[in-house]
């Protein structure tokens, strides 16, 4: 049973996911609208639209991560449930997923209400792209984004750079998949604009199945790493050895041995070399 503190934290997390997802869509679509309206006929939108969504994700993850984790994506929520059921049980996942879909719907509605002559932000398959191609494009692009979350945020590596890395992974994935599928990588990002615009397009289901398969693929990668007991590349993986006393120290940035400096505080006398 959940105690009062856990319930409060889960409700706060769900609120953070609702607001964060709404602002992620609002800022991403709003920025894209600005570029589309002011750079029509130029190649700029092809670069700027992925940038808007990537930067919006970066900013909102940075803001909301301390509250909810800054997930904003039902597919990635499923991956978190699959990789960390202790900290992310199914009932927390369902609460987050509902909040994310509602937040995306609210953010899409705000854009439609506030932005004058806002174009349709629905994700649609491009002409000439088959359903299978679109499905696999969404799947593999989402797996990249999910791995960024699992490694940078879920494993607590890159604590301060995690929001930037996650935003950049969306940016590069959107550059790759955008011309073909609209680069959803997020069922909530697809459903909100689709409902507001009442436009679902061809094979709309791939925007739910593809990202979910991609997130599960990334979860599979994560489990393989755990089974093989392979740690993420990090400073602690590098064994450094003080040339004076021979003591190993994992801090690659350390230029001298602290214990040796107690006797002689001149750091230039010591050198630590990396050992394989």
UniProtKB/Swiss-Prot annotation:
UniProt KW keywords: Cell membrane, Membrane, Repeat, Transmembrane, Transmembrane helix, Transport
Keyword Transmembrane helix: yes
Gene3D superfamilies assigned to the protein according to its UniProt record, in alphabetical order: Glycerol uptake facilitator protein (1.20.1080.10)
GO molecular function: water channel activity
Short sequence motif NPA 2: positions: 186-188
Residue ranges, Extracellular side: 32-46, 115-133, 181-204
Ranges that cross the membrane: 11-31, 47-67, 94-114, 134-154, 160-180, 205-225
A single cellular component GO annotation: plasma membrane
Secreted among keywords: no
Span(s) of short sequence motif NPA 1: 73-75
Activity modulation notes: Polyethylene glycol (PEG) stimulates whereas glycerol inhibits the aquaporin activity.
Pfam families per record: MIP
Location of this chain's protein in the cell: Cell membrane
Catalytic reactions on record: H2O(in) = H2O(out)
InterPro entries listed in its UniProt record: Aquaporin-like, Aquaporin_transptr, MIP
Side of membrane Cytoplasmic, spans: 1-10, 68-93, 155-159, 226-276
Entry membrane topology: Multi-pass membrane protein
Gene induction: Expression is increased significantly in arbuscule-enriched cortical cells and extraradical mycelia of maize roots under drought stress.
Domains: entry comment: Aquaporins contain two tandem repeats each containing three membrane-spanning domains and a pore-forming loop with the signature motif Asn-Pro-Ala (NPA). AQPF1 has NPS/NPA motifs which is in accordance with the fungal aquaporins (NPx and NxA).
Family: Belongs to the MIP/aquaporin (TC 1.A.8) family.
Protein's job: Water channel required to facilitate the transport of water across membranes. Stimulates plant drought tolerance by facilitating the transport of water from the arbuscular mycorrhiza fungus to host plants.
Protein name as annotated: Aquaporin-1
Organism whose genome encodes this protein: Rhizophagus irregularis (Arbuscular mycorrhizal fungus)
């Amino acid at each position: 049973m959940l105690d009062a503190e856990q319930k409060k934290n889960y409700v706060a997390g769900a609120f953070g996911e609702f607001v964060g997802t709404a602002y992620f869509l609002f800022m991403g679509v709003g920025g894209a609208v600005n570029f589309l309206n002011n750079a029509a006929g130029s190649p700029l939108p092809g670069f700027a639209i992925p940038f808007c969504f990537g930067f919006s994700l970066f900013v909102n993850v940075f803001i909301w991560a301390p509250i909810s984790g800054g997930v904003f994506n039902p597919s990635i929520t499923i991956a978190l449930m699959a990789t960390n059921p202790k900290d992310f049980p199914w009932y927390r996942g369902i609460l987050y997923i509902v909040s994310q879909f509602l937040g995306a719907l609210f953010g899409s509605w705000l854009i439609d209400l506030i932005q004058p002559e806002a174009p349709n932000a629905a994700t649609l398959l491009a002409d000439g792209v088959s359903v299978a191609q679109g499905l696999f494009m969404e799947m593999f692009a989402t797996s990249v984004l999910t791995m960024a979350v699992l490694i940078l945020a879920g494993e607590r590596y890159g604590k301060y750079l995690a929001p930037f890395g996650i935003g950049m992974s969306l940016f590069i994935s959107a550059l790759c998949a955008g011309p073909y599928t609209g680069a959803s990588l997020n069922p909530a990002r697809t459903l909100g604009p689709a409902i507001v615009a009442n436009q679902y397009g061809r094979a709309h289901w791939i925007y739910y199945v593809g990202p979910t398969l991609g997130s599960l693929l990334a979860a599979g990668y994560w489990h393989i790493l755990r089974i093989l007991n392979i740690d993420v590349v990090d400073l602690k993986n590098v064994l450094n050895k003080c040339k004076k006393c021979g003591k190993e120290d994992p801090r690659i940035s350390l230029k001298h041995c602290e214990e040796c400096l107690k006797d002689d505080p001149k750091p230039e006398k010591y050198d630590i070399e990396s050992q394989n």
